[in-house]
């Protein structure tokens, strides 16, 4: 992939831009040394790399607004960055750009168990949202494979899901509202703390937009009570087609598993070689997980 040519006029103004950024951010939050900006040259898609001109790490919504106003004034491209775990290259900068990382914005701002809502800064990691409410037996449902490290900002940008999206949906199904900063620095709030907020469904546009419409700084998320228990079952098949038909039959039987994972023979062999899990000799596997009370689990297992 050929990277776009940088704007030489912007590069010539680097010192002026850094000076302006230092008026609104502490020194440690402005990274302009080429040896240090190299850390932001890519996300988890490491095949493509390009160090940014500058990286900034604001810690408040107002600081994000101030940064974007400066960049807007100087016509500097801005690339928002969560935790850099994406494999899609969404946080790949250009040589004349400013990377705006939200990693320092990781606080829990409000928790409302009665209404099953939590408000967090967007740099908070996915798994730590559940960690913040687990003592009250709640959890945050979307669970991408990188949930230990990925940021809520990135989850919103990519509309991330995970193994349990079959029952609980992806980020857009669990996002109630955001505070975000438009590219000219204007701060806006969209949605709210309730499932049905008034107005147009702008959240549906924001979620999955890969940061192109603005920088999300706060997110209001739905939290759910933890189920009493969960149990997986592994089913072997002699063909991929039969496994696929079984998925439809499970749903038709009135069972909504919390997760269904499909593995074909090549994947089974690779996983067995690595994990030595004792997978059976077969053409396809389904790993189906159900949850609920012990009675509910047994009933679902019987129907499966």
Predicted regions and their residues:
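Noncatalytic alpha-helical scaffold of FAD-dependent oxidoreductases
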Residues: 1-304
